[in-house]
Curated annotation (Swiss-Prot):
HAMAP family: 16SrRNA_methyltr_A. S-adenosyl-L-methionine binds at residues 28, 30, 55, 76, 101, 126. Specifically dimethylates two adjacent adenosines (A1518 and A1519) in the loop of a conserved hairpin near the 3'-end of 16S rRNA in the 30S particle. May play a critical role in biogenesis of 30S subunits. It catalyses: adenosine(1518)/adenosine(1519) in 16S rRNA + 4 S-adenosyl-L-methionine = N(6)-dimethyladenosine(1518)/N(6)-dimethyladenosine(1519) in 16S rRNA + 4 S-adenosyl-L-homocysteine + 4 H(+). It comes from Bacillus anthracis. It is an enzyme of class 2 (transferase). InterPro entries: KsgA/Erm, rRNA_Ade_diMease-like_C, rRNA_Ade_Mease_Trfase_CS, rRNA_Ade_methylase_Trfase_N, rRNA_adenine_dimethylase, SAM-dependent_MTases_sf. GO terms for molecular function: 16S rRNA (adenine(1518)-N(6)/adenine(1519)-N(6))-dimethyltransferase activity; RNA binding. Belongs to the class I-like SAM-binding methyltransferase superfamily. rRNA adenine N(6)-methyltransferase family. RsmA subfamily. This is Ribosomal RNA small subunit methyltransferase A. It is found in: Cytoplasm. Keywords: Cytoplasm, Methyltransferase, RNA-binding, rRNA processing, S-adenosyl-L-methionine, Transferase.
Length: 292
């Protein structure tokens, strides 16, 4: 049987079931097996590994994962795809398709039901563009015991995840993802290898979870509030952004100026110039004056 991810086989499956693509679900099917193999290779899936997929579509990536992994669990929100997946994944007895929105699912419950304790598990997915960041944050914040993620996403979002201080892509998203994971851009994927063709190019990004966050912070929630406030208006200085946007902190510019100076950060700098280490130092100093 030919791989699913070829133009002809994809076309045949779509026509056979009279499937119409829903733009609202970000449905773009990959038709290049080489790209799929790069995704699976970088996930380093072995014969004892597990994989979680989100948005399997007609099963193109699922099929490649099933050939290598011990167990594959795929979350698919679109009921119309279930009979198609029943057919395309019939040769593989190690795949479970769950008809749920991953953002609303109890992922810990699914994880404990489907995988063995201590099993090596990766999240491997061609993520729907419109919910890429909510999915990543849900799985990171809920501390799902996975080794990491190899995910395809809009190139622009991938650039933001991997961005360094001082670049226009760098922002609160870069810091939040790099706080939890090591980020690597595997490759750029042209829009031409999808059906239907999206308006933008994609990128494959690998995120490997750190054993512990990259910096030590006294109050994690407050740390992220400081980061978000610092980027509230990109053209404004740290001083302006923090005095106007940091909730739970006294509206006292003199105090703010003193703390910034004490930790060696010029109040006139902009948020995009600070490293994650500087944000941690700043947050740990500011939290001492937080309003209770």
């Amino acid at each position: 049987m030919k791989d699913i991810a070829t133009p002809n086989r994809t076309k045949d499956i779509v026509e056979k079931y009279g499937f119409s693509f829903k733009k609202s679900l970000g449905q773009n099917f990959l038709i290049d097996t080489n790209v799929l193999n790069r995704i699976v290779d970088h996930a380093e899936i072995g014969s004892e590994s597990g994989a979680i997929e989100i948005g399997p579509g007609i099963g193109a990536l699922t099929e490649q994962l099933a050939k290598r992994a011990k167990k594959v669990v795929a979350f698919e929100i679109d009921q119309r795809l279930l009979p198609i997946l029943d057919e395309t994944l019939a040769p593989y007895g190690n795949v479970t398709v769950i008809n749920k929105d991953v953002l609303k699912a109890d992922v810990h419950e699914v994880f404990s039901e489907q995988f063995e304790e201590g099993q090596d598990v990766m999240v491997v997915a061609n993520l729907p563009y419109y919910i890429t960041t909510p999915i990543l944050f849900k799985l990171l914040e809920e501390k799902l015991p996975v080794r990491g993620f190899v995910v395809m996403m809009q190139k622009e979002v991938g650039d933001r995840l991997a961005a360094k201080p001082g670049t226009k892509e760098y922002g609160s998203l870069s810091i939040a993802i790099q706080y939890y994971t090591e980020v690597e851009t595997v490759m750029t994927v042209p829009r031409t290898v999808f059906v239907p063709q999206p308006n933008v190019d994609s990128a494959i990004i690998r995120l490997l979870k750190r054993p512990k966050p990259v910096v030590e912070v006294t109050d994690e929630t407050f740390f992220f509030e400081v980061v978000r406030a610092s980027f509230a208006q990109r053209r404004k200085t740290l001083m302006n952004n923090l005095s106007n946007n940091l909730n739970g902190f006294p509206k006292d510019k003199e105090l703010l100026d003193r703390i910034l100076t004490e930790v060696g950060i010029d109040p006139k700098r902009r948020g995009e110039t600070l490293s994650i280490e500087e944000f941690a130092t700043l947050s740990n100093a500011l939290v001492l004056h937080k309003l209770s």
